[in-house]
């Protein structure tokens, strides 16, 4: 509102007061002619302050109304909105007049055939885009809706595959363990059979030796008995001879 204060360069020198040029020309005032009092000046300032806020409020209201209409028209029309939307500050009602002018300009722009043709062209473009997009939505809409269910199915299938692989691995491990246990059993049976076969052979040898020893003892005992039975000792008689036959 007020310009910045400038520093005072030419300071007045102290001395007796000098008469003003008007006082030189006109002389002193008559005693009846006095300046306005301080109270009257204060009342004038108060009235001016009351008038200025009212003017500013009217200008703001006018600018707000014009801006709202301008914004609405600029959305629908290219280059819409009046040029004189801003009100004149200090004059009440100027904003309302500017907004009315903006509304009239917007109506004129709507009635303009060029603006109507541009609006129709934009509407046709929007309809064409909608016609192109609707079949794609009809085709891919169910897929998009079923995406969560498809994801669930995929996760379940992956889990089932994992469980199947785990079951196969467990069955393979069990089969390997069973085969190893069977092999161990077979080796144990073979070793036990070999031990059984080796034991009778070793036991048969001493039996044979025992039988041979028994036979030898029997032969030894039977041989002297035969000799005793075969050759009885003859009884000799003194003074007697036996005839011998010579052939």
From Swiss-Prot:
> Which Pfam families does the annotation name?
YqfQ
| Start-end of Low complexity biased regions | 1-12, 21-43
Q: Which InterPro entries match?
A: YqfQ
Compositionally biased spans, kind Basic and acidic residues = 170-196, 210-229
Q: Superkingdom of this entry's organism? A: Bacteria
Region entry Disordered, spans: 1-43, 157-247
Bilayer-crossing residues are none
Q: What name does this protein carry?
A: Uncharacterized protein YqfQ
Q: What organism is listed for this UniProt entry?
A: Bacillus subtilis (strain 168)
Gene of this entry: yqfQ
């Amino acid at each position: 509102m007020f310009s910045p204060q400038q520093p005072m360069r030419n300071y007045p020198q102290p001395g007796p007061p000098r008469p003003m040029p008007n006082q030189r020309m006109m002389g002193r005032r008559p005693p009846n002619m006095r300046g306005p009092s301080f109270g009257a000046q204060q009342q004038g300032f108060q009235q001016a302050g009351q008038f200025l806020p009212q003017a500013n409020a009217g200008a703001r209201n006018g600018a707000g109304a014009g801006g709202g209409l301008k914004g609405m028209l600029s959305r629908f029309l290219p280059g819409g909105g009046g040029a004189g939307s801003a009100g004149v500050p200090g004059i009440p009602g100027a904003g309302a007049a500017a907004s009315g002018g903006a509304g009239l300009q917007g109506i004129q722009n709507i009635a303009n055939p060029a603006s109507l043709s541009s609006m129709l062209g934009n509407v046709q473009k929007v309809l064409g885009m909608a016609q192109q997009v609707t079949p794609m939505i009809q085709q891919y809409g169910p897929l998009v809706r079923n995406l969560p269910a498809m994801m669930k199915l995929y996760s379940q299938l992956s889990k089932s595959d994992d469980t199947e692989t785990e079951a196969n691995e467990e069955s393979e491990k069990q089969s390997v363990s069973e085969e190893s246990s069977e092999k161990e059993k077979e080796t144990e049976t073979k070793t036990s059979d070999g031990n059984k076969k080796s034991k009778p052979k070793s036991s048969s040898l001493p039996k044979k030796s025992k039988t041979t020893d028994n036979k030898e003892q029997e032969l030894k005992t039977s041989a002297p008995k035969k000799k005793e039975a075969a050759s009885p000792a003859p009884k000799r008689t003194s003074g007697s001879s036996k005839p011998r036959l010579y052939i």
